[in-house]
């Protein structure tokens, strides 16, 4: 039977991929984080639901794998893209622990990650090389996150930041800004997008020096331009290098 890991739960229905919608419709059981399941309730009224809360990812994915082994068609819901800070990797790791002859098939269905949705709202900030960095230190040491941010800034990558702030991480974004300021001008464009792709999405365009941290929360995606990025007509533009 097919164990499906898919995405799009955080998007408005028009933004979900057709393949993801079809996978949901063909599944017997939907497994996911309660918040994400609520976002697709219009599509799963007739499905069996297995949901749980934050920091229960292993239990959630193990349940999905167990159900698939039993013969059910299971859809595991991730926000954005399942392969970008989502559940795809965990599901595949758990499947590898099952004897080969009993392993369920798994199809990873791509979706629209927050960096891309945020970039579209801001204009064209990701037109050149970029790095995506999460500031969550639940599974990655803060020192390693800082090192990655420093190297990305030194390499002049556009930087997309996930999980920039939470109740327990109120200063991390400011620390990253100070790291990037060692390599970028204070006027470097910065975009903050809240609820990317969801109802109520809004965004702010500012600069690295004046980054309005009061506009940032755990539902925000922050994009910091590179040395060539600029602001024009309410957009952040990162030139690709075309001769104009």
Predicted feature residues:
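A polyampholytic, Gly/Pro-enriched intrinsically disordered region
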Residues: 72-78, 124-135, 154-155, 209-218
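A contiguous loop/helix-start segment that scaffolds small-molecule binding in enzyme catalytic cores
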Residues: 154-244
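Single conserved hydrophobic/aromatic residue that forms the stacking wall/gate
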Residues: 1-8, 12-13
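Class I SAM-dependent methyltransferase SAM-binding "motif I" and its flanking Rossmann-like core
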Residues: 18, 86-155
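Gly/Ser/Thr-rich loops at beta-strand to alpha-helix junctions
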Residues: 80-85, 112-114, 166-167
């Amino acid at each position: 039977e097919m164990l499906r890991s898919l995405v799009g739960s955080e998007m408005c229905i028009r933004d979900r991929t057709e393949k993801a919608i079809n996978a949901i419709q063909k599944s017997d059981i939907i497994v996911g984080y309660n918040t994400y399941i609520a976002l697709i309730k219009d599509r799963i009224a007739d499905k069996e639901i297995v949901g749980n809360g934050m920091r229960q990812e292993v239990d959630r994915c193990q349940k999905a794998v167990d159900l698939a082994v039993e013969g059910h068609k299971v859809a595991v819901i991730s926000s954005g893209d399942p392969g970008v800070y989502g559940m795809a990797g965990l599901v595949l790791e758990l499947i590898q622990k099952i004897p080969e002859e009993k392993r369920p098939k798994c199809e990873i269905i791509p979706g629209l990650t927050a960096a891309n949705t945020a970039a579209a709202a801001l204009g064209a900030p990701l037109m050149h090389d970029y790095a995506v960095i999460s500031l969550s230190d639940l599974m990655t040491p803060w020192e390693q996150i800082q090192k990655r941010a420093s190297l990305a800034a030194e390499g002049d990558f556009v930087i997309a930041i996930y999980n920039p702030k939470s109740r327990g991480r109120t200063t991390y974004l400011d620390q990253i800004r100070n790291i990037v300021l060692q390599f970028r001008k204070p006027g470097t464009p910065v975009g903050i997008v809240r609820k990317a792709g969801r109802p109520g999405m809004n965004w702010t365009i500012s600069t690295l020096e004046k980054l309005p941290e009061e506009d940032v929360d755990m539902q925000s995606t922050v994009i910091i331009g590179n040395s060539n990025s600029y602001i024009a007509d309410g957009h952040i533009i990162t030139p690709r290098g075309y001769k104009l």
